Amino acid sequence: MEQLSFDISRSSKSRIIASSGVFQIELLDHAGEEDFPQLIEISKHLAKEYGDHAVLTKATICRYFNKPGSLPFIARYRNEIIGYIIGIPVKDIHSEPWARLDENFGKANTLYTYAFVVLSKYKGHGYAKMLKRVYLNWAKKKDGIRFITGHVKAGISKNFT
């Protein structure tokens, strides 16, 4: 059984990857307690579409955002987190029943897009598109990753042409 480490520090550690005026995208090296409330609040918007299991907790933030090999990005507007996207190697979520259905399960070559959300009031400004593009570009450069997968709501992908 995998042992979870709850090394929770107060401060997040991140690197700014892209910015434009008051908007920026950061690659999270470590999600700290200071950002937990914003991440949890934003994740509540996923519950409307995907159910309560999509709402983040301290445990899921530590498990996925701080996991070696994961690819978590946050979007900030005027220093407030307005969205995030996180990729996790499929091999690292083997306990999820649906992960075993992935055609590349067990090959250690696939990144699963675990969650992607931008607050509604910031949609229509290109922030979600920029966040997704940065994520995809970084995912393509990750050693050993050949495929990127995930679950999306029907019709949503047409917004990312």
Regions found by a protein language model. Give the residues of each.
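Feature marks short, surface-exposed loop/turn motifs that line or immediately flank catalytic pockets
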Residues: 46, 89-93, 156
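Conserved acyl-donor/pantetheine-binding loop and adjacent beta-alpha core of acyl/acetyltransferases
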Residues: 81, 85-115
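Conserved GNAT acetyl-CoA-binding A-motif
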Residues: 139-154
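Short amphipathic alpha-helix that is part of the acyltransferase structural core
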Residues: 8-60, 67, 72-77, 81-82
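Conserved acetyl-CoA-binding loop-helix of GNAT-fold acetyltransferases
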Residues: 115-118, 124-138
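Short secondary-structure capping micro-motifs at structural edges
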Residues: 60-62, 71-72, 97-104
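Conserved active-site tyrosine of GNAT-family acetyltransferases
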Residues: 159-161
